[in-house]
Design a protein with these regions (language model features):
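Beta-hairpin "wing" of winged helix-turn-helix
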Residues: 51-67
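Key DNA-contact positions within bacterial/archaeal DNA-binding proteins
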Residues: 39
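A short alpha-helical element within helix-turn-helix/winged-helix DNA-binding domains
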Residues: 25-35
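Short amphipathic alpha-helical interface segments
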Residues: 10-21
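Alpha-helical residues within the helix-turn-helix
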Residues: 32, 49-50
Length: 70
């Protein structure tokens, strides 16, 4: 059985693969599309970043994107 955190992490990765197109997307957009609390995603995204599945950029036009092509 996959944990809730694991399911949500997978949903984030799939969402970025479908909507990212190589550009950085704010987690707020992903949270809204996936109907997941932004606060909960803020706990999951650092794990995906440490695993080198995502990379982040801060500032205007920032957000997260996949480190590899889907």
């Amino acid at each position: 059985m996959i944990s809730t955190r694991g399911r949500y992490a997978l949903r984030v990765l799939v969402d970025l693969a479908e909507h990212g197109g190589g550009s950085y997307l704010p987690m707020k957009e992903v949270a809204n599309r996936q109907e997941i609390s932004l606060k909960y995603l803020e706990r999951i995204v650092p794990l995906l970043t440490r695993a080198r599945l995502l990379e982040g950029q801060s500032g205007k036009g920032g957000g997260y994107r996949l480190t590899r092509e889907p």
